[in-house]
């Protein structure tokens, strides 16, 4: 997560580790679909700064697709998103990296909440967030799509709790089957270390 106390300012921090990395771009204060052009441009610039660091360590980037404040602004915000998308695609090509948009939670001002929104991403891949899809009651439909990466966590279908596997209502048997079929990468996005360890054991037993 490239923000707050985890803001990445120097890719050298990764040199001590042998893991493969996926960087989640900053999202607080960011809106690549903003109707305020200065905010949209600044948000894109922050994403491109993230691309520059990610390219140094060979990591793909996950980002949020933006949001709109009022339903009457949705079409205009979609056009702003499309403008940002083209700029981000050009920058990703310049940096020789992949980036993916994450499907968002249940709040209706978010862009990209259901599989119906996938065409708006063009030829850019996406990160299937299982918990967010569960909140929007469309996880089975998402599992039938061609996703590139997956965020794994559980919830009760009402709150984006990022709970450990088994603490919510998601059936992870079809989730793991879809992950294997897609050949996608995945990360556990559980709120604490104990939950990560429990989740890892349960997923390995499936």
Name each region found by the language model.
Residues 60, 112-127, 133-206:
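Histidine-acidic metal/acid-base catalytic patches
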Residues 1-49, 124-125:
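N-terminal pre-domain/capping segments
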């Amino acid at each position: 997560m490239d923000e707050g106390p985890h803001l990445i300012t120097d890719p050298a921090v990764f040199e001590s580790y042998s893991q493969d990395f996926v960087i989640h771009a900053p999202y607080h204060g960011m809106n690549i679909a903003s109707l305020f052009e200065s905010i949209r441009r600044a948000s894109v610039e922050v994403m491109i700064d993230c691309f520059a660091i990610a390219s140094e360590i060979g990591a793909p980037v996950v980002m949020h697709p933006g949001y709109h404040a009022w339903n009457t602004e949705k079409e205009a915000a979609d056009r702003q998103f499309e403008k940002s998308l083209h700029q981000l695609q050009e920058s990703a090509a310049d940096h020789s990296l992949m980036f993916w948009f994450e499907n968002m939670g249940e709040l209706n001002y978010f862009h990209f909440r259901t599989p119906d929104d996938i065409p708006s991403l063009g030829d850019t891949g996406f990160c299937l967030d299982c918990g967010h899809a569960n909140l929007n009651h469309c996880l089975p439909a998402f599992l039938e799509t061609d996703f590139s990466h997956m965020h794994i966590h559980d919830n009760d279908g009402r709150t984006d709790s990022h709970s450990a596997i088994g603490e919510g209502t998601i059936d992870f048997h079809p989730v793991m089957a879809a992950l294997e079929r897609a050949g996608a990468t995945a990360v556990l996005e559980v709120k604490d270390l104990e939950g990560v360890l429990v989740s890892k054991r349960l997923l390995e037993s499936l």
